[in-house]
Amino acid sequence: YFTTPNQMKSFFATPQLNDYWAFSDGLCSVPNFQDFLPLKILQEHDKIPGGTFIINGQTGDYISGGHIPEALMAPSISADILFSAIIGKHFSLWKSLKTPKTLNEIRAELATRFKITFSKNIDREEAIAIYERFEYEERQAKYVINGQRNYELLGLNWVLPFWESDVVNFWRDVPIEAKFQQKLYRNTVDHWNYRGIFRDIKTTVGHWPGIRKLILG
């Protein structure tokens, strides 16, 4: 189900949005409410049967290697390249905040947390491990999985099969070459192609409107 811009705008003026923010706030990220309004509307129209379990795809692209940047695939990585990869992915949405002072503070924090020495290069496996660990601790755990609060406030059950221990442990041990650009995952689903869903079903991916540049700065 897709919500319209007018529906979303109206939703922002309702007490329910404040209720959701208070319910989902874990003092670690802004609330993730992207599923809340569509599911709420579906509930109001009796489209979700009792006892339903919500299963989303979080976070299959991340654990299967889809977030590994090409810049980290060289045999030896400098600290600056690793820092640039992390900053480019996680600290570049608000351009006005990317000041030299802020970037230096981020670099210092990363160097301390991961015991990185500027004068020494890092081998590829360690650099990617640091990159993925940072995303796991700072984005996946704090923001992405916070989206499950959407279902809880609406009284819906949920499961996250891609975060089951067996699945996570499997991808943890897959060689970097097979994870980069999701090579193993893509080859597997292309060969398996269960009921044609990986080749025959076309999806539409929406994009933010051009005004995002004005909003984000």
Model-identified regions with their sequence ranges:
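Alpha-helical membrane-targeting segments
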Residues: 201-217
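ATP-dependent adenylate-handling active sites, centered on carboxylate activation for C-N bond formation
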Residues: 1-126, 147-198, 210-213
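Core structural elements
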Residues: 133-147
